[in-house]
Amino acid sequence: MQESVMQRMWDSAHLSGGNAAYVEELYELYLHDPNAVPEEWRTYFQKLPVSGGAAADVSHSTIRDHFVLLAKNQRRAQPASAGSVSSEHEKKQVEVLRLIQAYRMRGHQVAQLDPLGLQQRPAPADLAINNYALTDADLDTVFRTGDLAMGKDQATLREIHQALQETYCRTIGAEFTHIVDSDQRNWFLQRLESVRGRPSFSPEIKSHLLERLTAAEGLEKYLGTKYPGTKRFGLEGGESLIPLLDEIIQRSGSYGTKEIVIGMAHRGRLNVLVNTFGKNPRDLFDEFEGKKVEGLSSGDVKYHQGFSSNVMTPGGEIHLAMAFNPSHLEIVSPVVEGSVRARQDRRCDAVGDKVLPVTIHGDAAVAGQGVVMETFQMSQTRAYRTGGTIRIVINNQVGFTTNKQEDARSTEYATDVAKMIQAPIFHVNADDPEAVLFVTQLAVDYRMQFKRDIVIDLICYRRRGHNEADEPSGTQPLMYQKIAKQRTTRELYADSLTQSNVLDNERVQAKVDEYRAALDNGLHVVKSLVKEPNKELFVDWRPYLGHTWTARYDTRFELKALQELSSKMLAVPEGFVVQRQVSKILEDRQKMGAGALAINWGYAETLAYATLLFEGHPVRISGQDVGRGTFSHRHAALHNQKDGSTYIPLQHLYEGQPRFDLYDSFLSEEAVLAFEYGYATTMPNALVVWEAQFGDFANGAQVVIDQFITSGEHKWGRLCGLTMLLPHGYEGQGPEHSSARLERYLQLCAEHNIQVCVPTTPAQVYHMLRRQAIRPLRKPLVALTPKSLLRHKLATSTLEDLTQGSFLTVIPEVDQIDPSKVERVVMCSGKVYYDLLDKRRNEGREYIAIVRLEQLYPFPEDDLAEVLAPYQNIKNIVWCQEEPMNQGAWYCSQHHMRRVAVAHKKELFLQYAGREASAAPAVGYASMHAEQQEKLLQDAFTV
């Protein structure tokens, strides 16, 4: 509907003639310094229409100055006689433009970035005037400034050179010319050059800066005095991080951001928790004194703890979340990205305006850890993008004891890895708080406008050792001689403010005293902290607390509704041409839905997702080749053979259904699994699935499995319902395509921390997946899924199995065998069951019963005992596995099996049938594989 005339008048009332002078004055100010006008006016001016090909707008005062300059140079502008003078001038003009570009590209190499002054880098020849056929005689010659945003079209070479040095060679080193997109490059040119890299801040802002620095320094001094020698991984030397984070929060709040998730390592973490998040200092002191936190099992050290709070900003209340993390550096970054994506999905924030990720790195780790590259690589992909991350490097120029650049990295800067995604990088001297503030404003504005990553390289130093008990001068003698004489950032900035009459010494000291008094009294020290936060910003986890793995659940689904869902799931849009083989799969699934064909694995799995969506559970699946499935069994994404378009039927079941996200991941295990862990810990109602291409490759993410998935609840109380599907099975494909390393997961099992399942029928995987979402328990599920069973003639189920059944932790003997005649029970898991069944039937050994353990942890002792109960005459009980003896379930689960066997019949001794112990999971020769397989099957019946 067209807006009314009155509405248009109201909307443009601020532009009426009476306000023209004010608006023009604001615009004049904007042209000189875009940072100097309020955010809403800056946004308005940025959206003003520009004629095609027109140059950037110029302020009126600049035009007036230009005419004065023309008058002064009128005589010079007239050539004496020949065109050679003009030609020579034009050649020099080209050189001037080259000089401008050189400063933009390489000015950062001579910027004053190191607070200690230890960096001695030779100035690039590109920045010397005489490198461009220019001499000192040209310094007062007037040249066109090109696109140099210095406020005028022409200036002397001296003025141009001075502007370039002030913009690019002071305490900010800007790297953005590697960005391909010209709009982004021009945006930085305008923002930097218009203020020569140093905007003027109001006295109020400067006072607030000092207050934040006082807080950062004050906490470290207080802890150092009260708990001397105790590890805290202090921020001393990098105190500018606190005003930096404060500006990110307040400025992003003015954009309408509702949540910020921060991931960081140990350095400065306690300072951030108290001075940014508003953690009560008294609680921190309790942790220093070793008091146990109620409700946690093992707990973790204080500098790994997460936290959340709400603070007030100009745009309203913001929820802050600090991610829990281990000491494994950089691995928390993709976890943060996953948590942010879940929050964005929950808010239907597809653009990334409402939730902002911030990750804080160390210089040594950001340059050295491979997961950093993986996390950057995922930043613009459909599956993992979050609208851009502000990445901060606390660059204290030393990694524990390593500070020689030739040892620490092969790149010029620790941040060079970010250039792979064309992220702008701003190196800034941490002893210049106003430069830090300006760079932070640029970072927030850039991220909000372009929705891409940006890096702030906060170059500082580490006043003490790696931790407070470490003496660093033994390995960095010269650096620590310099640090011993270095005044703190707060002291330097306080002197600057008193000398410029912004504050007097009494007010400076008052800030110090006020902060110390707050700590002494155990008071919150974040003034913007919201004492009664808006609970709508939280997720209610209460329904998922206090449950055991035996909690009741119902995964049945009414037949008629199931068939209706099946029809919708198999519907293809008119004119959508699928591949011939895929068409046959869909036809077969139609028959399965009608009960005319036995149900296979792919159909049962996708039906599980459809029913969960119907019941209100979002579903997210990612991993390599998950749309089709590595083994062509899933086909949840259909591809049009005519135009290449993709159709995902599970996204079109009914109007207003929950999200169904299906993403083929880029080729990463570590970052992707960490991302999905972060997502699952933030979206408890969803079924979040990561599938490995082969289970063998999951160990590329072993850090995520060890430090988060299996231990996160025990250490931090973090619930997680992530499901891992790991294709596993010995089919003669060699040592790298046979084993998901089941033994690794079982070895990590304790205190009911995870679930390990090995489903062998379509109905089992259907109920297993539904159980994971429907049951209120939120524990990670590790499922070893099959490969050859996907199309095995015996590995099928019926519609009744899906509509009436449930997940069976133990499946009893399926053939009609007289229990009283059974002398041997063979227990097994996975694909080997069908090999055993086939052999038993062929050989007619009806005195042998075969029992499947479908859940290996938590071990279902009661269910197994119930299945064994009818067999009162057994003489032998055997565990059979395809894996070598030192792998698989044997070592980690035999004590559970033995306990049940002995309870059933005291004289029973559990025997082993399987491959001999091996350093590799499997052999590489088909003939040897077949020989081993036949032997273990024979052993199962005779050992």
Positions of predicted regions on the chain:
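Conserved phosphate-handling catalytic cores of large alpha/beta enzymes
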Residues: 401-410, 419-455, 459-465
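Active-site cores of enzymes that catalyze phosphoryl transfer or operate on phosphate-rich substrates
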Residues: 197-219, 285-337, 341-348, 649, ...
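Extended, charge-enriched "interface" segments that sit outside catalytic cores
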Residues: 48-241, 257
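Flexible, glycine-rich loop/tail regions that form catalytic "lids" or insertion modules at the edges
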Residues: 94-101, 108-143, 230, 452-454, ...
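Active-site pocket-lining segments that scaffold enzyme catalytic pockets across diverse folds
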Residues: 223-282, 590, 599-618
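Subset of Sec-pathway N-terminal targeting signals
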Residues: 2, 7-48, 54
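Phosphate/oxyanion-binding active-site loops and adjacent basic polyanion-contact surfaces
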Residues: 234-245, 324-336, 368, 432-436, ...
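Cofactor-binding active-site loop characterized by glycine-rich and histidine/acidic residues
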Residues: 258-422, 426, 631-683
